[in-house]
Amino acid sequence: WIMGHMVNEVYQIDEFVDLGANSIETDITFDDDAMAEYSYHGVPCDCKRWCHKWEYVNTFLDGLRRATTPGDSKYRKELSLVVFDLKTGDLSSSTAYKGGKLFGQKLLDRYWNGGNNGGRAYIILSIPDLDHYAFITGFKEALKNAGHEELLAKIGYDFSGNDDLGSTRTALNKAGIKDREHVWQSDGITNCIGRGLGRVRDAVRNRDSSNGYINKVYYWTIEKYVSVRDALDAEVDGIMTNEPDVIVNVLNEGNYRGRFRLATYDDNPWETFKR
């Protein structure tokens, strides 16, 4: 999966998919009542990016729904996976549950069209703080209470704070997520700084072991050719990037052409890939 980074205005969906992304990452900020408010990153953000692009969440979700609904004039069939980078820093461990519940209701209304022919993308809830695991609990409750538990088949989970893998597993279990139940594990840092692949390799080992908790591993945020090759050599499943075309170019190189291909909608992002 080539995961376009910081896609926070609707027009950027086309921009990143045109460059080769089959997945996007969108930042979600919350108001004082734990309601998702804007798709917005703010400063600081990645080098060579403008940090202030934004939409109201409802506007963004409407655009995203159209981009992932077959038959819509804005439909992009390549776009199969969306990561919501949930900026829960202003929530507490007690309001995280409420935030999750409200976000679940909002996705149901605006993205899934009330459960009636809405967007088809798979969605990862990416949470920066292990203490906010109740966001997941609240989100799941919202869909169950609305009679749309079936939509949880489209939802995956990630903790993005580069925490200890054992602690991450514990937080997922506390949220009611079983091992390998739609679990993506991220690792990374802003593109302004280099970061080694030690934890990525640990996560890949966990993914490939008989008793791990991870289905997929992704690395963020890179666009240098050498970094992309190193990440692919570490056997990641996804790369988050500001320059999707760089990842496309590397995937077309002789060393990688036969080992990797771009994921399509038919590739289940919750299934661990076995070579």
Swiss-Prot record:
Gene Ontology BP annotations: killing of cells of another organism; lipid catabolic process
Q: Which GO terms describe its cellular component?
A: extracellular region
| Location(s), subcellular | Secreted
UniProt-annotated catalytic positions: H5, H41
User: What is the protein's major site of localization?
Assistant: secreted
Top EC class, one word: lyase
Q: List the disulfide bonds.
A: C45-C51, C47-C192
Catalyses: an N-(acyl)-sphingosylphosphocholine = an N-(acyl)-sphingosyl-1,3-cyclic phosphate + choline; an N-(acyl)-sphingosylphosphoethanolamine = an N-(acyl)-sphingosyl-1,3-cyclic phosphate + ethanolamine; a 1-acyl-sn-glycero-3-phosphocholine = a 1-acyl-sn-glycero-2,3-cyclic phosphate + choline; a 1-acyl-sn-glycero-3-phosphoethanolamine = a 1-acyl-sn-glycero-2,3-cyclic phosphate + ethanolamine
Q: In which tissues is it expressed?
A: Expressed by the venom gland.
InterPro entries documented for this protein: PLC-like_Pdiesterase_TIM-brl
* UniProt entry tagged with the keyword Secreted: yes
Needed cofactors, names only, are: Mg(2+)
- Under which EC number(s) is this enzyme classified? 4.6.1.-
The alphabetical list of record keywords is:
Cytolysis, Dermonecrotic toxin, Disulfide bond, Hemolysis, Lipid degradation, Lipid metabolism, Lyase, Magnesium, Metal-binding, Secreted, Toxin
The lineage's top-level taxon is Eukaryota
Residues where Mg(2+) binds:
E25, D27, D85
| A molecular-function term among this protein's GO annotations | phosphoric diester hydrolase activity
Q: How is the cofactor bound?
A: Binds 1 Mg(2+) ion per subunit.
The text of the family note is: Belongs to the arthropod phospholipase D family. Class II subfamily.
Instruction: Provide the function of this protein.
Output: Dermonecrotic toxins cleave the phosphodiester linkage between the phosphate and headgroup of certain phospholipids (sphingolipid and lysolipid substrates), forming an alcohol (often choline) and a cyclic phosphate. This toxin acts on sphingomyelin (SM). It may also act on ceramide phosphoethanolamine (CPE), lysophosphatidylcholine (LPC) and lysophosphatidylethanolamine (LPE), but not on lysophosphatidylserine (LPS), and lysophosphatidylglycerol (LPG). It acts by transphosphatidylation, releasing exclusively cyclic phosphate products as second products.
> What is the protein's given name?
Dermonecrotic toxin LhSicTox-alphaIV2
Q: What is the lineage of its organism?
A: Eukaryota, Metazoa, Ecdysozoa, Arthropoda, Chelicerata
